[in-house]
Structures are given as structure tokens and as C-alpha cells.
Amino acid sequence: MPTITIISYFGLLLASIIFTLVLFISLSKIQLI
């Protein structure tokens, strides 16, 4: 099913975006302290 592949790909993309956001927030917090 192509829909499952699209959903899994979207989930992977969302997870990577959240990971980069958390990484940037932690980096900015380290620079603030």
C-alpha cells in the first residue's frame, strides 16, 4: 500500500524536524547559561 509508505515517511520527517528543534533549543539554552 502506497498510503502506508507516505504516512511512515511523513512520520519520519516529523520526527527529524522535532529532533532538530529540540537540538536547537538545547544549544540556545547552553549559550544562554
From Swiss-Prot:
One MF term in the entry's GO annotations: electron transporter, transferring electrons within cytochrome b6/f complex of photosystem II activity
Biological process annotations from GO: photosynthesis
Bilayer disposition of the protein: Single-pass membrane protein
Stretches that traverse the bilayer: 4-24
Disulfide bonds: none
Pfam families, alphabetized: PetL (PF05115)
Keyword set includes Electron transport: yes
Subunit-structure text: The 4 large subunits of the cytochrome b6-f complex are cytochrome b6, subunit IV (17 kDa polypeptide, PetD), cytochrome f and the Rieske protein, while the 4 small subunits are PetG, PetL, PetM and PetN. The complex functions as a dimer.
The protein's name in its UniProt record: Cytochrome b6-f complex subunit 6
Gene name per UniProt: petL
